[in-house]
């Protein structure tokens, strides 16, 4: 099945130029994956579903306002940010990752695909949010990272402006209870949790609204968000 057909099955409509950009992006990921660990998914049709559908289906569930700023925390090989950027060129993206090799690869992807209003930054989230350039500067923070919701919220919510949103792409929604207290401490409130399936796998989108500023002591350093979650 072609990528276009797969996307159509999930009600994701892209033009031919956008499809071509996604396919070129996949080729870049799979080529670099031969010398660097970017993804365990190397079969193309599976890549279409697990990376492209998984990233783009968010646009069917959440309405991002036009021309807004988004930071993707722990972006890895660029998911979900780069597919969303290809689909929604109006959005302005920052891709954050703590591994320099990955960030160098993402910069190459941005150049190869001629994407604009998008940058890749090499930094740890807990360091990045200590700077005025990044703290509470974004309309949205999105993440597909595997951390538990309480840990993820401590890394992500400090980036979000009051009135903005953190969007967490998770597995089953039964873990959201774990994060509720942390989210409140960090200035957020779970607005909704949307359950859905991708390729018969349970997924959930946790939408968190930033209702007040995050206290300056967060995020904590020294690995505390993971070792000792709020």
UniProtKB/Swiss-Prot annotation:
EC category name: transferase
Keyword terms of this UniProt record: Cytoplasm, Methyltransferase, rRNA processing, S-adenosyl-L-methionine, Transferase
Its EC number(s): 2.1.1.-
Keyword Cell membrane included in the entry's annotation: no
Coiled-coil ranges from the UniProt annotation: none
Principal subcellular localization: cytoplasm
UniProt GO MF annotations: rRNA (guanine-N7-)-methyltransferase activity
InterPro entries reported for this sequence: rRNA_ssu_MeTfrase_G (IPR003682), SAM-dependent_MTases_sf (IPR029063)
Family that this chain belongs to: Belongs to the methyltransferase superfamily. RNA methyltransferase RsmG family.
The protein's name in its UniProt record: Ribosomal RNA small subunit methyltransferase G
UniProt source species: Finegoldia magna (strain ATCC 29328 / DSM 20472 / WAL 2508)
Organism classification: Bacteria, Bacillati, Bacillota, Tissierellia, Tissierellales
């Amino acid at each position: 099945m072609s990528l276009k057909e797969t996307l159509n099955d999930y009600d994701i409509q892209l033009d031919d130029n956008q499809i071509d950009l996604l396919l070129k992006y996949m080729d870049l990921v799979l080529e670099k994956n031969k010398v660097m660990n970017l993804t365990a998914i190397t079969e193309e049709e599976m890549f279409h579903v697990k990376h492209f559908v998984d990233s783009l289906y968010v646009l069917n569930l959440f309405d991002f306002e036009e021309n807004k700023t988004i930071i993707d925390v722990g972006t890895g090989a660029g998911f979900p940010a780069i597919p969303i950027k290809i689909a929604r060129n109006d959005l302005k993206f920052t891709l954050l990752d703590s591994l320099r090799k990955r960030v160098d690869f993402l910069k190459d992807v941005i150049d190869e695909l001629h994407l604009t209003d998008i940058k890749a930054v090499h930094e740890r989230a807990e360091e990045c949010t200590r700077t005025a350039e990044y703290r509470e500067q974004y309309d949205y923070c999105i993440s597909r990272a595997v951390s538990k919701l309480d840990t993820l919220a401590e890394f992500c919510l400090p980036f979000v402006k009051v009135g903005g949103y953190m969007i967490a792409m998770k597995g089953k929604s039964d873990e959201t209870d774990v994060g509720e207290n942390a989210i409140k401490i960090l200035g957020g409130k779970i607005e909704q949790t949307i359950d859905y399936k991708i390729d018969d796998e349970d997924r959930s989108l946790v939408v968190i609204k930033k209702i007040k500023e995050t206290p300056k002591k967060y995020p904590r350093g020294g690995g505390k968000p993971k070792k000792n979650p709020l």
